[in-house]
From Swiss-Prot:
Family: Belongs to the cytochrome P450 family.
Pathway(s): Secondary metabolite biosynthesis
Keywords per UniProt: Glycoprotein, Heme, Iron, Membrane, Metal-binding, Monooxygenase, Oxidoreductase, Transmembrane, Transmembrane helix
Source taxon at top rank: Eukaryota
Name recorded for this polypeptide: Cytochrome P450 monooxygenase FSL4
Binding site for heme: 494
Keyword Membrane annotated: yes
Transmembrane segments: 6-26, 32-52
Length: 557
């Protein structure tokens, strides 16, 4: 337990004794008053040490460049919970001259070391990647959902598990799953079409307004269920089914109270609060347990099917299912419990990120009709029409502009625009000694828009053309492996990158091929007011109030 944690325990005990004496004995011993005064003075001294003395004189990083001014309460932020962490990091990186490392402070003068160049990034993400991990609070919070999924394994265990899971995520294997992605994307389109027909939008005949993110999350959840686990969750057809409702319980929006806990968690261990029997904890546990039971059931079924196939027809594996679970089971390297943890990790990380990218794609295309027409012509020429049926293969090489749009969305709108890691042992970053416990930060929001890492103008603008130039189709003009950190980099990079890069074009292509899309913001003709699109405060790059679009169904495809 930390020093301030012990202080909190002693203060609680003293105050409890104070109240007991006051209520039952109607007197307050001087010893209790002395204790309270001493504890108050200790807190003042502790606070002064960490907010003034340590940052100025004692931090081992005092020689690193840092912003010229700092608030004791808010650090280098413009306020408490009023500015997203990635905006703070980018502002600091742009205003403080540096050689790859910057010392800056968040609320309560909590120190961060911001990594800004490729040399330092390579140390954190590749060369010494296993020296860094998530904070204790983040580990505890996420492990309630995923258990010991791939993101929490370290060292050789991580290498072994990743190596044996990788066959399910190779580009070749994911390509075999794209017909499932396409079928589900078309299922989403049909659902939207039905909503448009039943909608209340009367501004233009044959149109309707839909909110993108709800449809996107249901589509990507069903995709990962069907293609990933061989189990259709059915939320596109029935968003109110038990699976959909239980799954939602796992993703409660962080409250202001949680933000405070995370902030103070740098000094006090609040993990016990996540075990209290309050409604949020009960709902999260219930949702997680429900999904884990489904995962166990599917794993048992896939294991039985695999055994039957291996013991029949002389072990002929032709026509074996291609979902993630079956592929992982075929390696014979995982226990059922380990595989359940990995399934939960894929569920948590594997659908929301693509759904959010799709939402931003609809936002960008929704006010760019010229881009829509260009990609629609391409999609309708080379991708299967809704009436094709029984699609066996989807080839994206023939739709370069669709790929360019998806690549640009992933560059400009990384799902995790900012990340922190904690040094789990003494290590080095760019020749700088980094003691155990140091919090190191890096930001895709910085690297993905860094003019030193990318060629071409207007890196803050949405410009798919950067991916259309000869020789830049796969790089967009980036000159480093650390230029685009949407999927991170190194041995701990996102294992599902190929999945997202195949799934997103299916969703965007099906949507643009089927509808004319118009972004809807502000007051409409019928008096309805729709929100202006903006970023939500939080850890991920999501829209604050959703993205609403007016859809007009297009025929003759």
């Amino acid at each position: 337990m930390s020093v301030i944690g012990l202080w909190l325990v002693t203060v609680t005990a003293t105050l409890s004794l104070f109240v007991w004496q006051l209520i039952f004995l109607l007197s307050i011993p001087k010893s209790i008053v002395v204790c309270l005064i001493a504890e108050s003075l200790f807190f003042v001294a502790w606070f002064f040490y960490w907010t003034v003395i340590y940052p100025r004189y004692l931090t081992p990083f005092r020689h690193l460049p840092t912003p010229a001014s700092r608030s004791i309460l808010t650090g280098n932020q413009n306020g408490l919970f009023t500015e997203n962490s990635w905006d703070v990091a980018r502002r600091v990186s742009q205003t403080v001259p540096n050689s790859g490392l910057i010392r800056y402070y968040v609320a309560l003068s909590n120190e961060r070391i911001l990594v800004t160049n490729t040399r330092a990034l390579s140390d954190v993400l590749t060369n010494h990647s296993h020296d860094f991990g998530k904070s204790n609070l983040a580990k505890f919070a996420l492990k309630r959902l995923t258990g010991n999924g791939l993101g929490f394994l370290e060292g050789n265990e991580h290498k072994v598990h990743r190596k044996n899971l990788m066959p399910a995520f190779t580009r070749k294997h994911v390509k075999e799953l794209t017909p499932i992605f396409w079928d589900k994307a078309m299922e989403m389109v049909k659902g939207m079409e039905a909503e448009v027909r039943c909608g209340k939008d009367t501004s233009t005949q044959g149109t309707g307004i839909v909110e993108i993110h709800d449809w996107a999350t249901r589509a990507t959840l069903d995709i990962i269920g069907t293609a990933g686990f061989g189990y259709d969750f059915g939320t596109l057809h029935n968003p109110s089914n038990e699976i959909g409702q239980q799954y939602k319980k796992m993703f409660l929006e962080p409250s202001t109270a949680f933000n405070w806990l995370e902030l103070l968690g740098n000094y006090i261990d609040f993990r016990f609060l996540m075990t209290l029997p309050v409604k949020k904890n009960r709902d999260l546990t219930a949702g997680s347990n429900f999904m884990r039971e489904i995962a166990k059931k599917v794993i048992r079924e896939r294991r039985h099917e695999l055994f039957q196939r291996m013991t029949s027809q002389a072990g002929n594996m032709k026509n074996t299912k291609k979902d993630i679970i079956t592929t992982a089971l075929a390696s014979d390297c995982f226990t059922d419990d380990q595989l359940v943890d990995h399934v939960m990790a894929f569920l948590v990380a594997g659908h929301e990120s693509t759904a959010t990218a799709f939402e931003w794609a609809m936002y960008e295309l929704g006010h760019r009709p010229e881009m829509q027409k260009r990609v629609r012509d391409e999609v309708r020429t080379y991708l299967p029409s809704p009436s094709a049926g029984g699609v066996k293969n989807i080839t994206f090489e023939s739709v370069p502009y669709l790929q360019a749009i998806c690549n640009e969305v992933l560059r400009l709108y990384p799902f995790l625009p900012f990340a922190t890691r904690v040094a789990e042992k003494d290590t080095w970053v760019a020749d700088q000694f980094v003691p155990k416990g140091t919090i190191v930060a890096y930001a895709a929001h910085i690297s993905n828009r860094d003019s030193e890492l990318w060629s071409g103008p207007a890196l803050d603008a949405f410009d798919p053309e950067r991916w259309m130039e000869p020789g830049k189709e796969s790089s967009g003009g980036a000159n480093s492996n650390y230029a685009m950190l949407t999927f991170s980099a190194g041995p701990k990079s996102c294992i599902g990158e190929a999945w997202t890069r195949a799934e997103l074009p299916c969703l965007v292509g099906a949507m643009v091929g089927s509808f004319e899309i118009e972004l809807v913001e502000g007051k409409q003709a019928d008096g309805t007011v729709y929100p202006t699109v903006d970023f939500k405060m939080g850890k991920v790059l999501k829209s604050r109030d959703g993205v609403f679009v007016r859809l007009r169904r297009l025929e003759d495809w």
